[in-house]
């Protein structure tokens, strides 16, 4: 338990930040699930549209530090590669 005023404040801030981060991570997962669902259905147009909506979200979370920038880049690259495979 936090004993000083400073420690109590930090505990409050950490709780708020943890909740915000969890919400944002959940949002990223939702966007990625939409892309994955379109890929599973082998629907190129839907997958492309979902991917276009997911990319800015991934970039924003990487900028905020919710996701590591390399992880965001890797996810985008793999999704794009999979979508390009649907086109052929």
Swiss-Prot record:
Keywords: Ribonucleoprotein, Ribosomal protein, RNA-binding, rRNA-binding. One of its GO terms (biological process) is translation. Residues 1-26 are annotated as: Disordered. Residues 7-19 have a biased composition (Basic residues). HAMAP family: Ribosomal_bS20 (MF_00500). Binds directly to 16S ribosomal RNA. This is Small ribosomal subunit protein bS20. The gene is rpsT.
């Amino acid at each position: 338990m936090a004993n000083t005023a400073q420690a109590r404040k930090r505990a409050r801030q950490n709780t708020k930040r943890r909740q915000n981060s969890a919400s944002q991570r959940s949002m990223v997962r939702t966007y990625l699930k939409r892309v994955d669902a379109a890929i599973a259905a082998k629907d190129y147009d839907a997958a492309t549209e979902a991917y276009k909506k997911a990319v800015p979200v991934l970039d924003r979370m990487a900028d905020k530090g919710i996701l590591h920038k390399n992880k965001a880049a890797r996810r985008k690259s793999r999704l794009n590669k999979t979508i390009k495979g649907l086109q052929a």
